Amino acid sequence: MYMDRHCVYYRKPLLESGTLGTKGNIQVVIPFLTESYSSSQDPPEKSIPICTLKNFPNAIEHTLQWARDEFESLFKQPAENVNQYLTNPKFVERTLRLGGTQPLEVLEAVHRSLVLQRPHDWADCVTWACLHWHSQYANNIRQLLHNFPPEQ
């Protein structure tokens, strides 16, 4: 490793850090005192960092994981939550016991599915699909190109 060799050569410490989704890691390397950076090996990645999926997918696995996550968040999870809401009288009570912002997110998604974005006919479904496509494949791409111009 280039940086590792130069840190040893110039006797300078190296602070290496990284993230993987919600996890983070840090390694302090002090020449001739601690293990060198290149002698350690990262464990195999189990998941793809969300920043990679959202902003910089660069492998087919990233595309597949993004598509799977997108499908589940659009068609699987909301449908399961709506079905639970309609059939289980204790759904709201159980949902309110979830941690953090989850109760709000789940209940807002149920409200969105049953009230705000409920389609009444086929034309509503087509309109929703067109708007979603435009958001994902036009607006988001334009925003990424604005935030990270290709010439950088």
Swiss-Prot record:
The keyword Nuclease does not apply. One of its GO terms (molecular function) is ubiquitin activating enzyme activity. It catalyses: ATP + ubiquitin + [E1 ubiquitin-activating enzyme]-L-cysteine = AMP + diphosphate + S-ubiquitinyl-[E1 ubiquitin-activating enzyme]-L-cysteine. It comes from the Eukaryota. SUPFAM superfamilies: Activating enzymes of the ubiquitin-like proteins. One of its GO terms (biological process) is DNA damage response. The active site is at residue 51. It is an enzyme of class 6 (ligase). Activates ubiquitin by first adenylating its C-terminal glycine residue with ATP, and thereafter linking this residue to the side chain of a cysteine residue in E1, yielding a ubiquitin-E1 thioester and free AMP. The Y chromosome form could be involved in the survival and proliferation of differentiating spermatogonia. Belongs to the ubiquitin-activating E1 family. This is Ubiquitin-activating enzyme E1 Y. The lineage of its organism: Eukaryota, Metazoa, Chordata, Craniata, Vertebrata.
